[in-house]
A protein has these predicted regions:
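Short, well-structured alpha-helical segments in soluble
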Residues: 69, 129-133
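Conserved small/polar residues in nucleotide/adenosyl-binding loops
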Residues: 166-168
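Catalytic beta/alpha-barrel core
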Residues: 80, 111, 137-146, 158-162
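Short, structured coil segments at secondary-structure junctions
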Residues: 75, 135, 155-157
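N-terminal active-site wall of soluble small-molecule enzyme domains
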Residues: 38-44, 119, 123-130, 146-153
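Active-site beta->alpha loop and helix N-cap motifs at the rims of alpha/beta catalytic domains
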Residues: 1-120
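Short beta->alpha linker loops
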Residues: 59-62, 144-147, 164
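Internal, well-ordered alpha-helical segments in soluble enzyme and binding-protein domains
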Residues: 97, 101, 124-127, 135-138, ...
Length: 168
């Protein structure tokens, strides 16, 4: 854990604008919930914690909210959240999923994770616009690993981050 935190701090010192813990490249699905909690409990000591983003990587709404609560109790309020995988979802289902999270934890800032190959769902521009309209302070950006949004999604004060190792 200490080496991971040190690595994150080092790349921040070199100019990185933020670090995601438990994203897909960080093998979130292979890290147990207890290991995630251990890591999260070690992050508040970093002087870069305001630039840390916690990827939830969980399909369960309850587990996602509980992990976010632990993060928030450690003064970590930015999250990368993918819609649950496995089942096929419509836009309204995805809006409902994020709405439940934000209703439970309104102090959170969320980056939507658009990665169809992992989740089975691809965000539409319409869905994102609805979420941002409904939650302008909480939905702050999208990581566009499916590359279907970055050219056409134009929302003020909203970040679009197109990148995936699949395309490198």
């Amino acid at each position: 854990i200490k080496k991971t935190v040190n690595h994150a701090e080092n790349i921040m010192e070199l100019g990185c604008h933020g670090v995601v813990f438990f994203g897909s490249t960080g093998q979130s699905q292979l890290i147990s919930l207890s290991e995630k909690i251990q890591m999260i409990n070690n992050l508040p000591s970093s002087h870069h914690k305001e630039k840390f983003i916690i990827g939830t990587g969980l399909n369960s709404l309850v587990d996602t909210i509980n992990l976010m609560r632990i993060s928030l109790s450690n003064k970590l309020n930015k999250f990368l959240i993918m819609p649950p995988a496995y089942y096929k979802y419509e836009d309204d289902d995805v809006i409902n999923f994020y709405s439940k999270i934000i209703d439970a934890l309104p102090e959170s800032e969320i980056i939507l994770y658009n990665f169809e190959k992992l989740s089975g769902y691809i965000f539409s521009i319409d869905c994102i616009e609805k979420l941002v309209s409904k939650f302008p302070k909480q939905i702050i950006g999208v990581k566009d690993s499916s590359y279907n949004l970055y050219k056409n999604l134009k929302i003020n004060n909203f970040s679009v981050m197109p990148l995936s190792l699949i395309h490198i």
